[in-house]
């Protein structure tokens, strides 16, 4: 038990100083300064490690938050394998966290979305996505509300596209088109006319394949979900 508990009501979280460093790391993350954010999260982890004798559920929450932050920084810096490790570590402290879960899903997707496609990794990403929707957790990440349920739906659509499943299977909630429609129901007319698509309201355009149509839609949706 920390000696500062009597004077610091946040001692069970690791203390005010530690929480301030963690919040500073998230501020840098939200500002897009991922390298600085990663360094600050690592500083927070080092401080938390020095308090190894403190074993409370609230301290576990702080550790989970730190590892989630390190995971997201690595994901933004294109280190998906390291990101996966830290998200998994975070879940060992706090299982039901939207931000951690969608980060882990994204890490598995990035690891699987290579040439050749690693369907094992993609399948895990899909499993996590279905679990997010069935678990009843919130629909946005409290530390960065730009990370929300739309990211999960887009990742589901991209994952099914990577596997070659372009369907709209409403019974099983699978297929790239199914998850596209969860993001934007306006594409529902593709069910009846799958070989044409009105691109940006500029007139009907013909495509060589349904695969090409789905790919173009995914690119358009990415620009909406992840605006520049």
Where are these predicted regions, by residue range?
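Flexible helix-coil transition and linker loops at the boundaries of alpha-helical arrays
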Residues: 10-12, 46-63, 92-99, 130-149, ...
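Hydrophobic/aromatic packing residues within the alpha-helices of TPR/SEL1-like helical repeat arrays
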Residues: 34, 41, 87, 122, ...
């Amino acid at each position: 038990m920390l000696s500062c508990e009597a004077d610091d009501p946040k001692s069970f979280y690791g203390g005010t100083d530690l929480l301030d460093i963690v919040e500073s790391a998230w501020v840098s993350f939200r500002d897009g300064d991922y390298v600085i954010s990663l360094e600050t999260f690592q500083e927070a982890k080092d401080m938390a490690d020095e308090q190894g004798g403190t074993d409370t559920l609230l301290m576990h929450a702080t550790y989970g938050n730190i590892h989630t932050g390190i995971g997201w920084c690595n994901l933004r810096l294109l280190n998906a394998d390291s990101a996966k490790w830290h998200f998994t570590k975070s879940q060992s402290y706090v299982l039901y966290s939207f931000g951690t879960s969608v980060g882990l899903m994204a890490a598995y997707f990035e690891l699987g979305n290579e040439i050749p496609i690693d369907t094992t990794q993609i399948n895990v990403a899909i499993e996590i996505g279905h679990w997010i929707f069935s678990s009843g957790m919130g629909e946005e990440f409290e530390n960065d509300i730009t990370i929300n349920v739309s990211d999960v739906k887009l990742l589901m659509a991209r994952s099914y596209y990577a596997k070659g499943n372009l369907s709209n299977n409403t019974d099983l909630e699978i297929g790239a088109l199914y998850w596209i429609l969860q993001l934007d129901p306006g594409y529902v007319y593709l069910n009846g006319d799958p070989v044409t698509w009105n691109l940006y309201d500029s007139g009907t355009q013909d495509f060589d394949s349904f695969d090409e149509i789905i790919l173009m839609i995914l690119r358009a949706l990415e620009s909406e979900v992840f605006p520049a």
